[in-house]
Design a protein with these regions (language model features):
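Hot-dog-fold acyl-thioester-processing enzymes
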Residues: 1-85
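Hydrophobic beta-sheet segments that form the core/acyl-binding groove
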Residues: 85-109
Length: 109
């Protein structure tokens, strides 16, 4: 186990790798059925006719999986202080079954 991290231990520009996560079409559909049941997330035929041309992950599913990487690979449970929130969250490109995303935390301020 590494040493606990406190606010004073961080330096601007520090990078912390979070690892990777791969999405499957089934988990995309399962998540969306429960939390974001829009046709392009849950219905293959409707999704084909959409601007995306197929099933895509809910942005909230993507955010949730990235949060899991963050907690598993970055948060020190001994010194966790909660989160002050997010300043910006954007989904720039659709995520599909088979896609793998990799996260990195960069200390900005």
């Amino acid at each position: 186990m590494t040493e606990p991290r406190y606010w004073d231990d961080y330096e601007v520009g520090q990078k912390f790798p979070l690892g990777s996560t791969t999405f499957t079409e089934q988990e995309i559909v399962d998540f969306a059925r429960q939390f974001d049941p829009q046709p392009f997330h849950i219905d293959a035929e409707a999704a084909k006719q959409s601007m995306y041309g197929g099933i895509i992950a809910s942005g909230w599913h993507v955010a949730s999986k990235m949060m899991r990487l963050f907690v598993d690979n970055y948060v020190d449970r001994r010194t966790a202080l909660g989160s002050p929130g997010l300043d910006e969250l954007r989904w720039l490109k659709p995520v599909r079954g088979g896609d793998t995303l990799t996260g990195t935390v960069i200390c900005a301020a």
